[in-house]
């Protein structure tokens, strides 16, 4: 396998070494390309002469799952490069990245998914000298680095211009010490979802106490599955005034039993909090009783699989249907049929933030086709085996009692016919 890229020749030798050399003279210049050796079984990279890298080196060695020796890349001239996104993604045998130590990264703006899936990588200390002043994007840089334990090389990174670091340490399951991140400048950080998802050894997050989160909008899944995380007091001073998404932020943090440090968080702009504390070890949610939920549209299962007995937000959100007594309601079924229902006095009922409500039983008072003619039956749009029959009572034995699980099991309805007619599932 061989070819030409720019003014460079490349060959893959019998021993699976990728050799890149100038076509003529002592210097060769690579151009942006679909790198033909991606997803191959090359084991080594060797540069001959001076090789100048292009501005974009995205996914250059993507899924080169047998690559172990890339030491020759230390000679690569990267002074023009500003995008190395996914360059070593999927290089699951790559352990030694010392060849990166003296790279000129002063222009680099995007390092997203650079080491994605580098399962053998244990330390990133060679990155300690990197000039990162122009970094903007750092999503998933170490995602899936399941052996990574030493991130001391990141201590002096200039992160003042980074806007997004979603998935940055996603499933770094051995990562325990994140103290090198304590001095990070996060004043321009906006997107932080999944940053520490699945860091199961992470116990001490005091390094994050100094983070500037004033601009952060997305925090969803940030600490999900951090099974050892017990103390979140370092987050008590976080400025969350810009946050809009906190979905599953602490989901399955099974050791977390005290959420009182979050008492003072500003949640007035948060729209999504579903599953936020799902599966945590908490028994009392009173600490967040004062949270402003005026912007919320989803609180589904926020305390599901916990020992919290009373959801403090229930009293803040009035139901869209009567909480007691019987009443009539409407729903839309398949083929546009409109069903008039009688919700009996003993029916359990629920609603979240919108107009859609749920109950566990109802009597069918009438069924009408889109053309206005009556019908005897109507079929649920979500369950073709659930049939409404004129004059009969239907029930939903699997009715979900969670007030804020708007799309959960139950007989869904609206309080007025027009809302039912306008609804599209």
Protein language model features and the residues they cover:
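Short, glycine-biased loop/turn motifs at secondary-structure junctions and
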Residues: 311-425
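Negatively charged
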Residues: 1-348
């Amino acid at each position: 396998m061989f070819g030409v890229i720019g003014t460079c020749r490349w060959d893959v030798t019998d021993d699976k070494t990728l050799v890149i050399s100038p076509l003529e003279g002592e210097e060769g210049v690579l151009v942006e390309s679909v790198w033909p050796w991606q997803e191959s079984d090359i084991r080594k990279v060797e540069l001959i002469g001076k090789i100048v890298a292009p501005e974009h080196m995205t996914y250059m060695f993507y899924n080169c799952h047998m690559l172990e020796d890339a030491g020759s890349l230390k000679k690569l001239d990267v002074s023009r490069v500003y995008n190395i996104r996914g360059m070593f993604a999927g290089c699951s045998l790559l352990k030694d990245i010392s060849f990166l130590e003296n790279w000129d990264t002063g222009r680099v703006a995007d390092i997203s998914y650079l080491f994605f899936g580098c399962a053998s990588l244990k330390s990133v200390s060679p990155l300690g000298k990197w000039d990162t002043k122009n970094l903007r994007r750092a999503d998933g840089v170490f995602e899936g680095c399941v052996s990574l334990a030493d991130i001391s090389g990141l201590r002096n990174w200039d992160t003042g211009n980074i806007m997004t670091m979603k998935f940055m340490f996603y499933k770094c399951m051995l990562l325990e010490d994140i103290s090198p991140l304590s001095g990070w400048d996060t004043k321009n950080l906006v997107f932080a979802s999944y940053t520490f998802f699945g860091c199961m050894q992470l116990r001490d997050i005091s390094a994050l106490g100094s983070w500037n989160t004033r601009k952060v909008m997305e925090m969803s899944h940030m600490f999900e599955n951090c099974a050892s995380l017990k103390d979140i007091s370092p987050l008590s001073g976080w400025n969350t005034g810009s946050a809009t998404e906190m979905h599953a932020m602490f989901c399955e943090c099974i050791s977390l039993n005290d959420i009182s440090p979050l008492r003072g968080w500003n949640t007035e702009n948060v729209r999504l909090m579903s599953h936020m504390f799902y599966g945590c070890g908490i028994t009392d949610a009173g600490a967040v009783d004062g949270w402003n939920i005026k912007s919320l549209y989803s609180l589904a299962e926020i305390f599901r699989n916990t020992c919290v007995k009373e959801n403090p937000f229930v009293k803040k959100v009035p139901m869209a249907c009567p909480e007691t007594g019987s009443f009539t309601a409407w729903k839309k079924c398949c083929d546009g049929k409109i069903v008039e229902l009688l919700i009996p006095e003993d029916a359990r009922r629920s609603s979240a933030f919108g107009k859609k409500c749920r109950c566990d039983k109802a009597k069918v008072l009438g069924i009408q086709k889109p053309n206005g003619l009556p019908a005897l039956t109507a079929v649920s749009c979500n369950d073709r085996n659930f049939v409404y029959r004129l004059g009969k009572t239907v029930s939903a034995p699997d009715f979900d009692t969670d007030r804020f699980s708007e799309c959960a099991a139950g007989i869904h309805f609206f309080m007025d016919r027009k809302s039912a007619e306008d609804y599209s599932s």
